[in-house]
Structure formats: C-alpha cells, structure tokens
Swiss-Prot record:
The keyword RNA-binding applies. The gene is matK. Keywords: Chloroplast, mRNA processing, Plastid, RNA-binding, tRNA processing. The keyword Chloroplast applies. HAMAP family: MatK. This is Maturase K. Its main location: plastid. Usually encoded in the trnK tRNA gene intron. Probably assists in splicing its own and other chloroplast group II introns. It is found in: Plastid, Chloroplast. InterPro entries: Domain_X, Maturase_MatK, Maturase_MatK_N. One of its GO terms (molecular function) is RNA binding. PANTHER family: MATURASE K.
C-alpha cells in the first residue's frame, strides 16, 4: 500500500502558476496565428485568404479580442444570454467572427498551456543523454521495432481509445499539472461557450469529439493529456505485472510541434480505483513479454501470453475507463486476435505475419532426404481500399476508385494544380515507402494523376486526352519522388513508370512526425 501511494504521490514541482495573465498578451495570439491558423503546410486546408482575412486584419481583431476579455461584465452577459454570442460580439448568424474568435482563443490558450511542458523538455534529454532523440519522434520508428519483435509473439489486441470525453474530466486532468485557478476557470468557461457556438463538434451532453477534420490545437492538447492519464495507469499495471524492469518512454504523436516525455501523471482518486479493483486481480497473473504502441485513438497490445491472459488485460482496460473516467466502454471495442492468422491496421499499414515454407534436398552418401524450413516474416502492405475511401471523401475519385475532377482547385493556375496533386502523391509515396507490395500504391498514383488531368481539362473546358498529350512527361514527373526521378534519368526508355528499387524493398524514414492527411482520414 505504501508503494502504491508513493507511486501516485503528486509532483507539485510540475505545476506552473500565473499563466492566466498571458491571455492578455498580443504576442501570444500572433504566435498562435503563425503556428496554428496558417495551415499552408497541410494539403487539405486552404490559405487564410480564402476565409477573407489576412495578417493585418487579424492583428486588429486580436486587439479587439483582448479588450473584450478585459471587460468583466462581458463574461457575465455571455453566461446569462446563451442565445447571443456576446463573447465574440456578434450573433450566431455571423459565422466568420464567431469562428475566427473562437479559433484564435483556442490556439492562443493551447500555446499557454503547453508552456509548462515545453520548459521541461530540454533538461531531461540532456540529463539522460539520449542520442538522436528527434528520430524517436518519427512514426516509422515503430516499424523496425515491430519487425524484430512481432515474430516472437502470439496475440495482438486492437484497442480503440474511447471518445467523446466529457469536458469536466478534461479540466480535472489538467488540475494535476496546472495550479493556476483562473486559467482553469477560463478553460471551463471557454469549453462551455464553445459548445454553444459549435454544436457540431460537441454532443448534447457536452462531450468533445477529438477526431474531427476541424479539430483545434487546444483539443489535441486536451486529448493528449487524457491519453497520457490512461497510459499512466497502464504503465503502473505493466510495471507490477512484469518480472523485468520497465522503462516508459512516451511521445505526443498527435502534436506536430509539441514533443514531450511524461513520467508522473498523478491523481489521488486513482489510488482508490487501483486498490478497489486492480489490487484484487493484478497479482493473479504475470506477463514478462508485452509491448504497447499507440497513435491517435488506436493502440495495439501484443503479448507472448495465452488468450486468457489477453482477456484479463482487456477487462482491466474496460474497468479503467468505466470506474476512473466514468465512461461506459463496451468490451467489443477491444479485439483479440492471433498474430499467425490476422492482419491489423495500424499507422496507415496493414501488418501481418507471413509464413514461407522452403524445401531443401540434402544428399548424404547414398541417402537423400528433404528438409522443410518454415520462416516467419513481418509484412506491411498499403491499404488500397482505405486509401480509395479517403480519396473519395476528399473528392479525388468515386467510392469505386474512378478518378474525378477537383472543382474547388480550378481557380488556381495550371502549375499550382499540378504542384498540389504532385505533392499529395509524393507524400503518400514517402509515407508508404515501407510497404512490401507497392502495386497498390501505383494504383493510387494513377487515380491522382488522372484526377489532376481531369481538373485541368475542366478548367480549360477541354478533354483529358488533350492535356495528357500537351503536358506529357511534365505531368508524369510531378508525381515522382526524388528517388524515382533519379532512376528515370538513368533508364528513361526501359522503364515507362520508374520505380525506386524493387517492389518488395522497404524503406523506413525517420523524418516523418505525423500521419499523412489521407491516411488519417481513413
């Protein structure tokens, strides 16, 4: 019991007071505008000019916003009148102002709450002298590890982390990290107001869906804190169910600009939960070989143990969410499968274990005999069906995979249209470079290439055949990666559609720190 209480003891040194005054600083919102609102780095978000404002007008709106936050009666009028959006100074029908102000506040607030964690990132890395820690942020960093480890495991559990999450639970989780009471009150007030402004993001019971296309930076941070709280309990259970010494290392994969190591996320209420339930069931089984990986709302748990052992872990997770987070979680959302005959979807790949049998004839004196050798290989494939569904949602093709034009891009220049399609194709090729079978990826490239030609033909009111003949090799080269372009210069005639290496050659890149948008949509 003393060991359990010591493990859950709160670390007050991590709490940072006096963050609330930062809400009234202009540079916070200027920083949020540069890092959050301007999403030119994403291929599925239009530039800010499309919404009708630029950096100059946004600066004026920031000053107006700070002035309104200073007015104390302004908050009271906003709470008393739920039909009028007084927090932004306009009625609900003025979508531009409500959308801009709420987005600006959420982005600025996200930067403020990230400050306590950003200050703690440099010192732990220097103290422990972790070499090339930036490589650990890569999503592809997980696959070489899976290649080496999954060959020796028996079962895999596909876990869907439950959402939506009630707003009060999110605020209570942050109370363990931040002791600035005004800031927490402002967060609670903002989330309730955000529920009134954007009812399509939040359900009627005031729970937040965190995987919408329009999910803001603040909600990504709140989701990370929620998942870290869940994984903290799992780390505790893992430490006490293993014979071996366990070291946890966690990354915030959902945040592109925020990377952290969390070791102590504590809550006193959790002691009661663990003592009441886990203390009776945890010590009844041990699992010395278990691995856990997560990205966004999906996690996998692989083990060398038996099916009964995996079921015990399954019900531990179910009870965790029901008793601690007060979330009714159905057990069917956790699937237990045998690795030898099951493919699981994770990080944009369909992964499985392939068994290859080879026969060798041996001759010894007058006797000859055959030796059958069975080898197991970790295989990763491109989920073609999922990607086609994502392309159809993004209006690049139909559900059946037939390419269509992109009408929203017809206002761009020809070079701009070709560059956008080419960038999407190159990003997909870069992300799925670890696939052992790339034929499916070539089909995705064909859909994007023909969709680009149809978009250009629609813009100029011409035929696809005309533009294919006019652009020729230029249109083709835009859809090559750098490696494919180098190979096309060497063998321009022998290979009409050059490939980088063999069909089964797998390359894992350590510079990919977020999932491709098309993969994320699937």
């Amino acid at each position: 019991m003393e060991e359990l209480q010591g493990y859950f003891e709160k670390d007050r040194s991590r709490q940072q007071p006096f963050l609330y005054p930062l809400l009234f600083q202009e540079y916070i919102y200027a920083l949020a505008h540069d890092r959050g609102l301007n999403r030119n780095g994403s291929i599925f978000y239009e530039p800010l000019e499309v919404f009708g404002y630029d950096s100059k007008s946004s600066l004026a709106l920031v000053k107006r916003l700070i002035t309104r936050i200073y007015q104390q009666h302004f908050f009271l009028s906003s709470v008393n009148d739920s039909n009028q959006n007084r927090f932004v100074g306009h009625h609900h029908t003025n979508f531009f102002y409500s959308r801009f102000y709420s987005q600006m506040i959420s982005e600025g607030f996200a930067i403020i709450v990230e400050i306590p964690f950003s200050l703690q990132l440099v010192s732990p890395l220097k103290e422990k002298e972790i070499p090339k820690s930036h490589n650990l942020r890569s999503i592809h960093f997980n696959f070489p590890f899976l290649e080496d480890q999954l060959l020796h495991f028996n079962y895999v559990s596909d876990i869907l982390i439950p959402h939506p999450i009630h707003m009060e639970i999110l605020v209570q989780i942050l109370q363990c990290w931040i002791q600035d009471v005004p800031l927490l009150h402002f967060l609670r007030f903002f989330l309730h107001e955000y529920h009134n402004w954007h009812s399509f993001f939040i359900t009627q019971n005031k729970s937040i869906y965190l995987f919408s296309k329009e999910t803001k930076r603040l909600f990504r941070f709140l989701y990370n804190s929620y998942v870290s709280e869940c994984e903290f309990v799992f780390v505790f259970l893992r430490k006490h169910s293993s014979y071996l010494r366990f070291t946890s290392f966690r990354t915030f994969l959902e945040r592109r600009y925020f990377y952290g190591k969390m070791e102590h996320l504590q809550t006193e209420h959790l002691i009661i939960v663990c003592c009441d339930y886990f203390n009776r069931t945890l010590w009844s089984f041990k699992d010395p070989f278990m691995h856990y990986a997560r990205c966004q709302g999906k996690a996998i748990l692989v083990s060398k143990g038996t099916h009964l052992l995996m079921k015990k872990w399954k019900y531990n997770f179910v009870n965790l969410w029901q008793y601690y987070f007060h979330f009714w979680y159905q057990s069917y959302r956790i699937h237990i499968n045998q690795l030898s005959n099951h493919s699981f979807y994770f990080l944009g790949y369909l992964s499985s274990l392939l068994k290859n049998s080879s026969t060798v004839r041996n001759q010894m004196l007058d006797n000859s005999f055959l030796i059958d050798t069975l080898t197991t290989k970790f295989d990763t494939a491109v989920p073609v069906i999922f990607l086609i569904v994502s392309l159809s949602k993004a209006q690049f093709c139909t559900v059946s995979g037939h390419p269509i034009s992109k009408p929203i891009w017809t206002d761009l220049s020809d070079s701009g249209i070709i560059e956008r399609f080419g960038r999407i194709c190159r990003n997909l090729s870069h992300y799925h470079s670890g696939s052992s079978k790339k034929q499916g990826l070539y089909r995705i490239k064909y859909i994007l290439r023909l969709s680009c030609a149809r978009t250009l033909a629609r813009k100029h009111k011409s035929t696809v055949r005309t533009f294919m003949q006019r652009l020729g090799s230029r249109l083709l080269e835009e859809f090559f990666t750098e490696g494919e372009q180098d190979l096309s210069l060497i063998l321009p005639k022998a290979i009409p559609f050059p490939f980088s290496g063999s069909h089964r050659e797998r390359i894992w890149y350590l510079d990919i720190i977020r999932i491709n948008d098309l993969v994320n949509r699937s």
